[in-house]
Amino acid sequence: MLKLLSEIGPVIAFFAGFFYGGGIQNATLYMLITSVICITLCYVIDKKVSKLSIISTTVLLVSGSITLISGDSMYIKIKPTILYVIFGIIFLMSGIRKNPFIKYALESIVRLKEESWIILSYRTAAFFFFMAVVNEIVWRNFSDETWVKFKVFGVIPVTFIFILLQLPLLLKNKLPDSKI
């Protein structure tokens, strides 16, 4: 639950900051503060923070700080693209190397045949590369308001749909001692 809150909390803060707090600058500030609080809470409570969360928060702190200092919203808008490309490369390379990173993230929930982890790595890499392209299209061609709405009402449902589409692979290839 804490992990979910730490992922969604900053997005909610950004959305609220944009629509109720005066625009993209305030939204960025609220998201930065919320992200630091969330990652700190994860560390204090769980005594660990995932590598992906560290990467995500670092990119956010850099792009968000540049946005606040420069007043140019482009930097916060390219943050998702940068993250999606980084994550895409991580999942792609881990699949190529036959050492799927996604296995370490999910094996406490589901145990799969090794080749299924590799397939899932490639699919996840493709998803992140796709999301990078979509983010670039949206932020470059639409208003700040449309981009913010896309981040909340587009990215979250598309991610959920992607996860649901992976269920047949997971269910077909799970090992007997798997939790799902």
UniProtKB/Swiss-Prot annotation:
**Which keywords, in A-to-Z order, does the entry hold?**
Cell inner membrane, Cell membrane, Membrane, Transmembrane, Transmembrane helix
Cellular location of this protein? Answer: Cell inner membrane
Q: Which GO terms describe its cellular component?
A: plasma membrane
> Where are the bilayer-spanning segments?
25-45, 49-69, 76-96, 118-138, 150-170
Which Pfam families did the record assign?
A: IspA (PF04279)
Q: Taking the first listed entry, what is the main subcellular location of this protein, grouped into a coarse class?
A: membrane
Q: Does the keyword Cell inner membrane apply?
A: yes
Q: How does it sit in the membrane?
A: Multi-pass membrane protein
Q: Which domain of life is it from?
A: Bacteria
Q: Which InterPro entries match?
A: YciB (IPR006008)
Q: What does this protein do?
A: Plays a role in cell envelope biogenesis, maintenance of cell envelope integrity and membrane homeostasis.
Homology family: Belongs to the YciB family.
Kindly give the NCBIfam families that the UniProt entry links to this protein.
ispZ, PRK00259.1-1
What name has this protein been given in UniProt?
Answer: Inner membrane-spanning protein YciB
The UniProt gene name for this protein comes to yciB
